[in-house]
From Swiss-Prot:
GO cellular component annotations of the record: cytoplasm; plasma membrane
Chemical reaction(s) catalysed: a D-alpha-amino acid + A + H2O = a 2-oxocarboxylate + AH2 + NH4(+)
Name recorded for this polypeptide: D-amino acid dehydrogenase
SUPFAM superfamilies: FAD-linked reductases, C-terminal domain (SSF54373), FAD/NAD(P)-binding domain (SSF51905)
Length: 426
């Protein structure tokens, strides 16, 4: 079967890999001049299945007003009358119940755990290199209230069989010695020993090279203009160079999936959430992080990537704006400086931003679309790197009409056959 994949971020390239390994002929269309040059370029670098949590949680309605007024707020909503933003915010608030939070988190963790298993298998098969470390992830709490709120997450982790360690202040420092000078800043932490770190850009570009060895045809610098449809099915993809045809089509366009599909009546619920990162060179090994640390207060991840530190996170609802705001840089520097002060060259760090494709439930859209021969693999939010391999593997199964490793009704595209059980249960 010939499959046309739209997009060459980490989701598109992993999708191409698993489709090619399943024996399909694969063509990848990408507007940039190479793989992983947009949202996958400089993300936080963490692969953290256990920390896969919905943004829509019971505490958000209470915390959001305080965040909006805080100097170093983890969330900023730029004033807008955009109907898509207002609809997305209302849908997210509807998911801020304990029942929906726990259900969505369980779906996310299941997919993320499966994805890590797929990544480990891929690494063993190929020997792919991407500054990978398997040293766990530590979520640090600056207040006792944050520590107490971790209880509901630990309950889900227990139910799903995910190992974890609840640590006091000294336990955190034992795992991350660089926190020694910040002992009065933290009260404790939650550590997941099975989590990993790695450079998503290096992984994606290396996997694209491996894909070529499997016969995948990458067509970089190709503008995707739209889908050609007739009789309820997709017949091709319009590009300036003509129509690209196949037997199946997979949309991996991240935050651009929603406007791309809207003319065909397909609503993914995906909205762009801007995140920022700094990439800094390590100047003092003893003060640097060993693996990934999550700063619960500022929603920032601080990750060791070889001889660099990646500081990433925050959330800004501002549509498709990609401007770099100095105030966001200041927040990243404040988080990293207060925990790993003197570890890296923050003033010379590279400042970057990207658009995460977020759904109101934080669960991605994977599987068949309402149009025949069309599939989606999008909406992974902040967890595209964590969920990439598993999402691609189950998507490849769906395209090939094989029984997937996970129940795809949990990630169904609205209006698709797989979404029917969810609609009836709603």
């Amino acid at each position: 079967m010939k499959v046309v994949v739209l997009g060459a971020g980490v989701i598109g390239v992993t999708t191409a890999w698993y489709l090619a390994k399943a024996g399909h002929e694969v063509v990848v269309l990408e507007r940039q001049d190479g793989a992983a040059l947009e949202t996958s370029f400089a993300n936080a670098g963490e692969i953290s299945p256990g920390y896969a949590s919905p943004w829509a949680s019971p505490g958000v309605p209470r915390k959001a007003p305080k965040w909006l007024l805080a100097r170093h707020a983890p969330l900023i909503v730029r004033p807008s009358l955009d109907p898509a933003l207002l609809s997305w915010l209302l849908a997210m608030l509807r998911n801020c119940t304990t029942e929906r939070y726990l259900a969505n988190k369980a779906r996310m963790v299941r997919l993320a755990e499966h994805s890590r298993d797929c990544l480990i298998a891929l690494r063993r098969e190929t020997g792919i290199q991407y500054d990978q470390r398997s040293r766990g992830t530590l979520q640090v709490f600056r207040t006792q209230a944050q520590m107490d709120e971790a209880g509901k997450d630990m309950e889900v982790l227990r139910d799903l069989g995910v190992p974890y360690e609840l640590l006091d202040r000294l336990g955190c420092i034992a795992r991350e010695p660089g926190l020694g000078h910040a002992r009065d800043t933290i009260v404790g932490g939650l550590r997941l020993p099975n989590d990993e770190t790695g450079d998503c850009f290096k992984f994606t570009t290396a996997l694209a090279d491996l894909c070529r060895g499997q016969g995948v045809d990458f067509r970089f610098g190709t503008t995707i203009q739209g889908l050609e449809t007739a009789g309820g099915e997709v017949g091709g993809v319009r590009t300036p160079g003509g129509t690209v045809t196949g037997d199946a089509y997979v949309v991996c366009l991240g935050s651009y999936s929603e406007p791309f599909l809207r003319p065909h009546g397909i609503r993914t619920g995906v909205y762009p959430v801007k995140g920022y990162s700094l990439t800094a060179t390590i100047t003092d090994e003893a003060k640097a992080p060993v693996s990934t640390l999550l700063d619960e207060t500022y929603k920032v991840a601080i990750t060791r990537l070889g001889d660099r530190v990646r500081i990433g996170g925050l959330a800004e609802l501002a549509g498709y704006d990609l401007s770099l705001r100095p105030s966001r840089r200041a927040t990243l520097e404040h988080s990293a400086g207060s925990l790993f002060g003197g570890s890296c060259d923050l003033p010379s760090a590279t400042f970057w931003c990207g658009l995460r494709p977020m759904t109101p439930t934080s669960t991605p859209r994977i599987g068949e679309a309402p149009l025949r021969r069309l599939f989606l693999n999008t909406g992974h939010g902040t967890l595209g790197w964590t969920m990439a391999c598993g999402s691609a593997q189950v998507l490849a199964d769906a395209v090939g009409r094989q029984a997937p490793a996970l129940d795809l009704t949990d990630y169904a595209v609205p209006g698709s056959p797989a979404a029917e059980p969810l609609r009836r249960a709603a």
